[in-house]
């Protein structure tokens, strides 16, 4: 390769770096094939899987730490933005990689994307760009819907050699793949043609790019923290097809224990964490690709195939703990953390102090967004609330509501707060299981000798740290109101997401307070043209302000229930269980708010579906 430049020395240096980049390819081309959907030049290897994991993890990092546009990016932006897609970097793509897919194919993919199709598209796209063999399976139900049947059977497969072009393969895969592809028993007909297999809970194999499947919902594992926490990428099923991060171990649930079915001990053992069944390109003596097949279960041992998840759940079900060396973790989540952590110890106080900085930052960013939204409403009028629409809801809408409302980002902020609660809860549990793992630096004055003492100390230190972290917001009359993290924690379920509301309500100013008295009346319009008074709309939105995840069904407003739904306990209450006995309660949302009389037109008593079946 020749480079023309006015600086010959730079050209030589660039050429050297260019060649070194290709030389650093973890899996250089060794195969030859120019037929089918795309050229195939590599086999899947352990190093290739690590390369894929790095690619997926980078997308997650950009979705959480990139610009505002990158954090809300849909699939077209993710794939075409060179900062988000490492495969747009020639050195990462490697020698013999395939070019970017067309914008028309990307539009087609976007239009059909859902949680399951995202888990299909990402490895398919990676295989295409890196010139790897790929295939998908077709499944059919034993009875009922393929997404919800007791189990499915594999009817056949389609490999890249079966398609005439890359666009054909992508489109066929987007049509044929659903969450039903995960519902294949290990011992069923053609089971060794399945797309995925259960994976070992082992840092060598449980990598970004693996999947998690729980009845009708699939996620892409995208990040494992130093402490062994699993973080995921998810895709909405609404028309906007948003891709968002899902930070929570609670999605790893619903796993069937081995032996649950006495007639077939492996029946139902398809939920949980799974690894892709990487295909093999069959080659002749000249290195030409002559076919593609699935790896067998035995061949997949190299990539982490294991049924241990179902054994673990069986032991936990029987004993309420599992023996892990000298330790006895009491939940599958704790076992995952113990096995997947990459640190020798944790320092709860140090973690809390650093995390409070991050938590404050996300609310400081929120303030700028609140002010921009208020300015938009003042200048261009009220924004219609997407009430009871088939194709839209408050989390996924079109136009101005999507741009200026904050229900989705507020879910993320609440989850960021509750992550701290969960992490500290984990630290208290670890103190009993392996006290040497929990370093008490900075907590010496508490003379900690028990889990109860540690939890009390962490609550005290959290309160101190939260009092020391503060920001401010501008009221509608431009007065400045200071808020500490203590204030934000107190108002956690009171922060309005409705862009029609003035900043006082957006920041949860208490009813009857001087802070709230300055809020001007601003109605919230609904699609039929009716305008809902501000205080009434605010109370009817109470349920949505309590959620820990986005909903996919229609959103209500008029006559929406305002109490009787469970609201998660905050950090102090969660840790208090270590030294107090508390009866479980159903918390009334927005208890400070007087509930208005229900609107006469309402018939709203609906079930809110939290997990889409795709």
Regions found by a protein language model. Give the residues of each.
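Bacterial N-terminal signal peptides that target proteins for export
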Residues: 1-8
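Bacterial N-terminal signal peptides
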Residues: 8-16
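Sec/Tat signal peptide C-region and signal peptidase I cleavage site
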Residues: 18-22
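Mixed-charge, low-complexity intrinsically disordered regions
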Residues: 24-172, 187, 277-594, 607-610
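A recognition module on extended beta-rich or small alphabeta surfaces enriched in W/G with H and D/E
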Residues: 160-195, 237-282
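...with weaker cross-activation on analogous glycine-rich loops/strands in unrelated enzymes
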Residues: 172-228
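Catalytic Cys-His active-site segments of thiol-dependent hydrolases/isopeptidases
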Residues: 222-245
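Intrinsically disordered, low-complexity proline-rich regions
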Residues: 595-599
């Amino acid at each position: 390769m020749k480079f023309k430049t006015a600086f010959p020395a730079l050209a030589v240096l660039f050429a050297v770096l260019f060649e070194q980049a290709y030389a650093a390819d973890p899996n250089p081309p060794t195969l030859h094939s120019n037929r089918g959907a795309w050229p195939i030049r590599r086999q899947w290897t352990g190093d290739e899987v690590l390369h894929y994991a790095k690619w997926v993890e980078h997308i997650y990092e950009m979705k959480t730490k990139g610009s505002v546009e990158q954090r809300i990016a849909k699939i077209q932006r993710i794939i075409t933005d060179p900062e988000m897609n490492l495969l747009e970097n020639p050195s990462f793509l490697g020698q013999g990689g395939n070019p970017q897919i067309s914008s028309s194919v990307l539009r087609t993919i976007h239009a059909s994307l859902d949680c399951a199709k995202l888990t299909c598209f990402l490895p398919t796209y990676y295989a295409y760009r890196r010139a790897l063999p790929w295939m998908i399976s077709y499944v059919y139900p034993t009875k009922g819907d393929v997404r919800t049947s007791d189990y499915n059977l594999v009817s056949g497969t389609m490999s890249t050699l079966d398609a005439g072009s890359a666009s054909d393969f992508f489109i066929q895969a987007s049509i044929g793949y659903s969450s039903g592809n995960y519902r294949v028993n290990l011992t069923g007909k053609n089971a060794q043609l399945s797309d995925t297999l259960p994976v070992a809970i082992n840092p060598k194999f449980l990598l970004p790019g693996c999947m998690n499947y729980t009845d009708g919902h699939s996620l892409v594992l995208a990040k494992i923290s130093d402490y062994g926490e699993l973080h995921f990428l998810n895709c909405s099923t609404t028309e906007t097809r948003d891709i968002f991060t899902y930070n929570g171990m609670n999605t790893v649930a619903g796993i069937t224990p081995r032996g649950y079915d006495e007639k077939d001990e492996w029946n139902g053992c398809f939920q949980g964490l799974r690894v892709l069944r990487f295909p093999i390109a069959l080659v002749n003596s000249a290195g030409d690709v002559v076919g593609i097949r699935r790896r067998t279960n035995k061949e997949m041992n190299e990539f982490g195939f294991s049924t241990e998840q179902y054994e673990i759940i069986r032991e936990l079900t029987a004993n309420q703990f599992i023996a892990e060396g000298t330790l006895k973790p009491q939940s599958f989540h704790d076992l995952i953390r113990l096995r997947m952590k990459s640190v020798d110890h944790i320092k709860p106080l140090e973690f809390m102090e650093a995390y409070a900085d991050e938590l404050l930052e996300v609310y400081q960013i929120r303030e700028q967004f609140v002010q921009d939204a208020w300015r938009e409403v003042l200048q261009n009028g009220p924004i219609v609330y997407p009430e009871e629409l088939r194709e839209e809801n408050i989390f996924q809408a079109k136009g101005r509501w999507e741009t200026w409302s904050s229900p989705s980002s507020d879910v993320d902020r609440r989850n960021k707060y509750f992550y701290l609660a969960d992490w500290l809860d984990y630290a208290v549990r670890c103190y009993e299981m392996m006290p040497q793992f929990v370093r008490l630096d900075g907590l010496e004055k508490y003379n900690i000798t028990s889990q109860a003492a540690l939890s009390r100390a962490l609550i005290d230190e959290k309160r101190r740290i939260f009092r020391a972290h503060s920001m401010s917001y501008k009221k509608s009359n431009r007065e400045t109101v200071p808020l500490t993290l203590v204030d934000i924690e107190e108002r956690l379920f009171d922060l309005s997401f409705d862009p029609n509301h003035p900043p006082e309500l957006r920041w949860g100013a208490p009813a009857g307070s001087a802070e709230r008295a300055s809020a001007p009346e601003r109605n919230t319009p609904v699609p039929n043209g009716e305008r809902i008074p501000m205080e009434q709309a605010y109370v009817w939105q109470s349920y949505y302000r309590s959620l820990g995840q986005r909903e996919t069904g229609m959103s209500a407003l008029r006559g929406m229930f305002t109490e009787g739904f469970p609201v998660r306990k905050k950090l102090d209450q969660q840790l208090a269980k270590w030294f107090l006995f508390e009866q479980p309660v159903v918390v009334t949302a927005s208890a400070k708010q007087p509930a208005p009389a229900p609107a006469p037109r309402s018939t709203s008593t609906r079930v809110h579906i939290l997990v889409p079946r795709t």
